[in-house]
Structures are given as structure tokens and as C-alpha cells.
Amino acid sequence: MGQEKHVFTIDWAGRQLTVETGQLAKQANGAVLVRYGDTAVLSSATASKEPKPLDFFPLTVNYEERLYAVGKIPGGFIKREGRPSEKAILASRLIDRPIRPLFADGFRNEVQVISIVMSVDQDCSSEMAAMFGSSLALCVSDIPFEGPIAGVTVGRVDGKFIINPNVEQLEQSDINLVVAGTKDAINMVEAGADEVPEETMLEAIMYGHQEIKRLIEFQEEIVKAVGKAKIDIPLYEVDQTLADEVKALAETDLLKAIQVHEKHAREDAISAVKKAVVEKFEEEDRDEATIKQAKDVLNKLVKNEVRRLITEEKVRPDGRGVDQIRPLSSEVGLLPRTHGSGLFTRGQTQALSICTLGALGDVQILDGLGVEESKRFMHHYNFPQFSVGETGPMRGPGRREIGHGALGERALEPVIPSEKDFPYTVRLVSEVLESNGSTSQASICASTLAMMDAGVPIKAPVAGIAMGLVKSGEYYTVLTDIQGMEDALGDMDFKVAGTSKGVTALQMDIKIDGLSKDILEEALQQAKKGRMEILDSMLSTIPTSRGELSRYAPKILTMKINPDKIRDVIGPSGKQINKIIEDTGVKIDIEQDGTIFISSTEEDMNQKAKKIIEDLVREVEVGQLYLGKVKRIEKFGAFLEIFSGKDGLVHISELALDRVGKVEDVVKIGDELLVKVTEIDKQGRVNLSRKAVLREEKEKEEKQS
């Protein structure tokens, strides 16, 4: 590629897409600067010169956010970017998934693909620019890669599909779909939707693929102009003589072990066969490299037989039919002090979800490159080692946990009631207690149960199911409700979540080059059938959301005031609102339109805070009577508090019907007097009269007599 700068441009979805090569990051194997509108992303691809001694392909994909891209300085003391945001982690996964299947089997050189977001135009997706740049950086490099791939975002407004919708269009869209693929097929799908039918989702996917083809043609033109020749990297291969020897030793016993239906018994049986082969080789003083290859042959034998049984005999490892769901059970209300809890079990996969309700002030504040500043609905996913019967370090959430949590959040968000109808922050935590595949979808089902148990008035229950695929040449089998072994040894993990009305979330990962429309259609329809069965099971446990919230959940009281009076409630430097919070123990959130949310676990404290606020914003009216308390006495009169925060003066001449010599002769501090407002002067000072009230009472008595 040399040192010369090259620039390539096309129009993409009504905006200019420009690629620059040859100027930046020239020591990487491949690097491109992608400009999409005012968004700019630098993508680079680098590979190690030697293969790593690993039994997997060491690919790392990073999407790096820089706050300077949106003109921000990071908060905190350090003033530099720290750990990646949730959005950055999800974007890294989004780019990794369509790229990973396009490296050859046996590729063991470490590959690192890094996209640095340098400028952000909110209407021009930095994630799509980074995906395009990551593919192109690999393609123009000398790293062997069977791309290119590209991705687009598809929205739908008023029934019409839109490629790469802007922020305003996305807010109106009932679909937010990211689809990626090669020129010939789709290999990654990620979507959120507002209960959209399967047929429409399939249309959106295929609509996006047409635009992907254009982007791939553009990449091919660039590669033809500036691409490097691919280097010859040796692939890891097993010695065929050794493979035949291991096969002769173990194949018969492995075939029997594979057909044991129970997970742990099957794993133990397979492990025993593998152990016998390894021990034989150790007795023969075979070297470590040979023993490692023997283990790889054994794993390949297991994989091939599981796949053969599924494609040729339609027999699954646990004996189910291809469209059969594992036994289902569910339960709610397990944890008495939580606001809501739901347990969902599907075979040997089990998730317990807990719903917690909070005030609107408990929203998550987002500090990133997007336009969204906060969110009031959160779903977090935890996967402890004991769920698979293993030990391991307890760390914070990794990419997988964050990805599964976000998928559940996307699936459930369309059914969360609006802030107006339900002024609460909602947090769901899903604890995976047992795992044999499809835990993310179990967490969606358990979370639905937890919200219904908590009394959240969701629009409809949501269930999720994971579909699998085993493909051999032109023949393929779509599997419903895949378990761990089918996920590990199969070709697809296609997660579909939704209500009885339609899809709310999709996520598809594959290990082959891509999928045809026919396979996608079959998988979606088979998933719909399974989802309906799961929903029926869940609704037999709890048919509708509970009619009232847990007594341990905060009670939220809503009131409305004149927006001009907000400053009176807050007070100088927040003094007034902090005093209300201190006196009552409530939480107070104030909207700009004057809507106030008061929350507490004690309803009487909510009412007390409401009364204080009402008094603070109350308008004094001339001619009205008020019961005031004497707060201060001067020679010329008494100052009364007629309601919280509002004082008025009763002049000495207005204290009684007769002449008063000293104020103290009539009132003392703490006395309560019924007074009438006679005047509010230009400075807002309130003049009161006790004499006027006494005169009216006297006249009334005289009339009655």
C-alpha cells in the first residue's frame, strides 16, 4: 500500500461515506480512516507473526470510545477514559460476531482489530462505520481473511424501511435492526422491536442485505486498488495417521457415550473415553504435542457424531425431537422482602430474576458518546460458576454478561409502561442458577415473571427461546430450545424473544459463512411456535400482573405545580428541598414542567411532604381568611406565618376592634389567630387584619340576634 494517501467515496443512505488509507497507522497490517457524515473512525488490523500454542482462534475486537469525539472531558479526578462503557462493549461484540466466522479453521495467529471513534455525528452511526472499517482494515491488510463483510441499521417508520435512520427516525421506528453479512448471505443479526411480526422482521433483514451488497462492492474496489497480497499462514492440522489411530481406539465407545441423555452422565461417559486414550498414550511415552493432538481428534469425533445424529437421524443428545422444548416450570414470590421475584426453569437451565422499583431519581446516568443521558429501565445478568458445577474466580461482569443483560433489556423494554403511567425506575437482576444452554432467554422469562409479581403493569408478557442449526452441505436441521452441547457443536445460536403479538428482540450468531432466507424464515416460525408454548406455561403460574405493589416498594405520589414556583420548592442552593427531604425522609424528583414525584415506603410521609410543597407554592389571595401563627412581635405589630414559608404583618391598629396600647397585651409568640388578607403591596409584602375578622363576626352575631 506504500505511504501514499488514497481517498474513496460513495453515497450511503443519503450521506457521504469516505475511506482514507495510506496516511494513518501505517505500521499496522491494515488501517483505514472511515468518515461517515461527520463521524470519523480509525480501524486497524494487526496479526502476530507466529501462531499461538492455543486450541482456539485468538481474535480480539475492540471498539474504543474517546469522549473528545463529542467535545467532552471525562469526569472524575483522573480526567481520562477508564474501563469501556456498556455501549462500547456491546459495539465490540457486534463487530466481532460477523468477522469471526470468516477466518479459516486452524488459524492460530493472534489477530487484533481496533476501532477508535474520533468524531461523532449522532445521525451517522459510529458502530456501523466501525464495522465497515474493521472489515476493510482486514481486507486491505496481508492477514488471510475471507471477507469482506458489512453491516447496516434498518428502521421502519410508517411502514417503510429506512437504512441507517437518524436519531429522530429511530425514536419513531418500531424496529431497530442491525444486520451484517457477506455478499451472498447474512451472518449476524441484532434487533429490538415493538412486537413486530416475524414476517416483517424477515423482510427487514433481507432489505438490509441488499444495502450490504453495495458496501461490499465498495470494499472490493478499495481492496483491488490498495490491498496487500495475503501472506501464507500455516494452519493448525492434526496428523492423519494419528487421527486414524485415535479413531480406531475410541470411536465405538464415544458413539455410545454421546447417546447418554442426561447432561452430567453424558459428560462423564465422554470424559472416561478420552481419559482412557490419554492414559494409553502416556504409558507409551508419547510427547505432549501428540497427546494434545489426540485430544483434538477426540473432540472432533464427538462433534462429528453429534452433528451426524442430528442431520441424518434427527436425534438430539438428550433424545428430544428437533422442535421439542425441555420441561418447563416457573414460580413467583420466592423472596419475601424483594419487590418481585420470578424463577424460570427449562430442563437444566434455571434463572431467578428479582425486580426492584425505585424513584425516578434512581435512573442510570449515561456518560458516553450517545444522545441518551439516562435510562429508567435496567436488566443485569449474572452467571456464577456454580451454575455449571464448576469453581472459578468471582469477577465483575464480562463481555458475555453485559451482552446477555443488554439482550434481555432490549427484549423487555417495549412492554415497560411509560413514565407517565408508571413513574418508577425499574431494575431487574437475573441470577443464572443452572446452565445447560439458553440462559439469556431464561433470564427474559424469569424477568417477566418478576415484574408481574412486583405489580409492574407491563403491556404484555415476554418469553425468549434459542434456536440452533446443524448444516451439512445442502442439508440442514433447525433445532428448537438448544442446550449447551448443541450450541457448542452446532452452527447457529439464534435467540428470539417476544410477546404473543410479535418479536421484541433478535440476536443471531453463526459459525458458518452465512444463512439463506429460507433457513431464517424456518427458524423464526419454529421459534414463534416455541415461544407461544413457553408463554402458556408462564401464564399458568401468574396470569396477569399483581393489582398492587409490594408493601416494601416505594409509594410514589405525583403532584403538579406552576413551573415558575419550582425555585420556591428548591430554595437557595437547594436549602428548602433538602429540608423537606430531611424532615420527611422522602425522595423528591422535579420535572421542568412542574410535575413533582414524591416517593417513600410510608404513604403518610408522602402526604406530609406534599402538604409542605403545597404551602410553599400556595398563592396568598386578598380577601381570604387564614389561620396564622405568631412568629415575631414588634412595637408596630405582629408577624404571622399563615402557611409554610409565607409571613404577613398584622399592624397594631388591626389587632383588635378597640385601640391597642402594646402588641403584647393582645398576642404572644405561638398564638394562632384567624386573620384576613387586606393587601399585597408592590414588593409582595402581605398585610393582614384581625380586626376585619372580628368585625365580620360581630356583624354576623348582631344579625342573628
Curated annotation (Swiss-Prot):
<dbReference type="InterPro" id="IPR015847">
    <property type="entry name" value="ExoRNase_PH_dom2"/>
</dbReference>
<dbReference type="InterPro" id="IPR012162">
    <property type="entry name" value="PNPase"/>
</dbReference>
<feature type="binding site">
    <location>
        <position position="493"/>
    </location>
    <ligand>
        <name>Mg(2+)</name>
    </ligand>
</feature>
<keyword id="KW-0460">Magnesium</keyword>
<protein>
    <recommendedName>
        <fullName>Polyribonucleotide nucleotidyltransferase</fullName>
        <ecNumber>2.7.7.8</ecNumber>
    </recommendedName>
</protein>
<keyword id="KW-0963">Cytoplasm</keyword>
<comment type="similarity">
    <text>Belongs to the polyribonucleotide nucleotidyltransferase family.</text>
</comment>
<dbReference type="Pfam" id="PF01138">
    <property type="entry name" value="RNase_PH"/>
</dbReference>
<dbReference type="InterPro" id="IPR001247">
    <property type="entry name" value="ExoRNase_PH_dom1"/>
</dbReference>
<dbReference type="InterPro" id="IPR004087">
    <property type="entry name" value="KH_dom"/>
</dbReference>
<dbReference type="Pfam" id="PF03725">
    <property type="entry name" value="RNase_PH_C"/>
</dbReference>
<dbReference type="InterPro" id="IPR015848">
    <property type="entry name" value="PNPase_PH_RNA-bd_bac/org-type"/>
</dbReference>
<dbReference type="Pfam" id="PF00013">
    <property type="entry name" value="KH_1"/>
</dbReference>
<dbReference type="InterPro" id="IPR012340">
    <property type="entry name" value="NA-bd_OB-fold"/>
</dbReference>
<feature type="domain" description="S1 motif">
    <location>
        <begin position="623"/>
        <end position="691"/>
    </location>
</feature>
<dbReference type="GO" id="GO:0004654">
    <property type="term" value="F:polyribonucleotide nucleotidyltransferase activity"/>
</dbReference>
<keyword id="KW-0548">Nucleotidyltransferase</keyword>
<dbReference type="GO" id="GO:0005829">
    <property type="term" value="C:cytosol"/>
</dbReference>
<dbReference type="InterPro" id="IPR036345">
    <property type="entry name" value="ExoRNase_PH_dom2_sf"/>
</dbReference>
<dbReference type="InterPro" id="IPR003029">
    <property type="entry name" value="S1_domain"/>
</dbReference>
<keyword id="KW-0694">RNA-binding</keyword>
<feature type="binding site">
    <location>
        <position position="487"/>
    </location>
    <ligand>
        <name>Mg(2+)</name>
    </ligand>
</feature>
<dbReference type="InterPro" id="IPR036612">
    <property type="entry name" value="KH_dom_type_1_sf"/>
</dbReference>
<keyword id="KW-0808">Transferase</keyword>
<keyword id="KW-0479">Metal-binding</keyword>
<dbReference type="GO" id="GO:0000175">
    <property type="term" value="F:3'-5'-RNA exonuclease activity"/>
</dbReference>
<dbReference type="InterPro" id="IPR004088">
    <property type="entry name" value="KH_dom_type_1"/>
</dbReference>
<feature type="domain" description="KH">
    <location>
        <begin position="554"/>
        <end position="613"/>
    </location>
</feature>
<dbReference type="GO" id="GO:0003723">
    <property type="term" value="F:RNA binding"/>
</dbReference>
<dbReference type="InterPro" id="IPR020568">
    <property type="entry name" value="Ribosomal_Su5_D2-typ_SF"/>
</dbReference>
<dbReference type="GO" id="GO:0006402">
    <property type="term" value="P:mRNA catabolic process"/>
</dbReference>
<dbReference type="GO" id="GO:0000287">
    <property type="term" value="F:magnesium ion binding"/>
</dbReference>
<dbReference type="GO" id="GO:0006396">
    <property type="term" value="P:RNA processing"/>
</dbReference>
<dbReference type="Pfam" id="PF00575">
    <property type="entry name" value="S1"/>
</dbReference>
<dbReference type="Pfam" id="PF03726">
    <property type="entry name" value="PNPase"/>
</dbReference>
<dbReference type="InterPro" id="IPR027408">
    <property type="entry name" value="PNPase/RNase_PH_dom_sf"/>
</dbReference>
<comment type="function">
    <text>Involved in mRNA degradation. Catalyzes the phosphorolysis of single-stranded polyribonucleotides processively in the 3'- to 5'-direction.</text>
</comment>
